[in-house]
Amino acid sequence: MTEIKTIKKRSGFRVMAELIGLVKPLSGYMCLAIFAGLIGHLCAAFITILGGYAVLAVLGVQDKITPMQVFITVPLLALFRAGLRYGEQSCNHFIAFKLLALIRDKVFRALRRLCPAKLEGRGKGDLISVITSDIELLEVFYAHTISPVAIAFLFTLILCGFIGNFHPLLGLLALIA
């Protein structure tokens, strides 16, 4: 009697967790990407926030920062934002392409072991094309999903804390929203 192995269907969450687990050897680059992205987003947010402070200063409502300080700080924040964005994207794509090379290597090594005849004959181009296109889809996940989600989470917490400095209920309302 032949034994038939059943393949367990994995949930999308489990697959995503396993894909994230592959990043572990490159976690330093991932932390750098998250840090650069977070600081860059804070720079972008504070361009607008400081503009609001400048308006309030002109109206005489606040005196913590002068309009001249805002006019000096805003262009610097914009320059920092540009450099940090570049750094974040560079780290994300470095991670993505390193992992794609690793995954491709593992997949093709397994294919050579499991079905060497299929890789020699007709249709090998179709098989390789399908596998390569599937692996390429992972680039989006590694370069454009993991760190942006972490950045959004941390950015939200920081800005809710900032808003909460004005009044704790405002910070809580921002967090709920």
Per-segment meaning from a language model:
Residues 1-43, 64-70, 88-92, 96, ...:
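Membrane-integrated ABC transporters
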Residues 30-84, 164-169:
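Transmembrane helix-loop-helix hairpins at lipid-water interfaces of multipass membrane proteins
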Residues 35, 39, 43, 47, ...:
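Hydrophobic alpha-helical transmembrane segments of ABC transporter permease domains
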Residues 61-62, 90-97, 160-171:
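Transmembrane helix-loop junctions in multipass membrane proteins, especially transporters and channels
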Residues 21-25, 60, 143, 147:
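Alpha-solenoid HEAT/Armadillo repeat architecture
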Residues 31-32, 66, 119-121, 140, ...:
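Short, hydrophobic secondary-structure boundary micro-motifs
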Residues 20-21, 57, 161-162:
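Surface-exposed charged/polar residues within alpha-helices that form helix-capping/stabilizing sites
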Residues 12, 44-52, 77-120, 124, ...:
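Juxtamembrane helix-loop junctions of ABC transporter transmembrane domains
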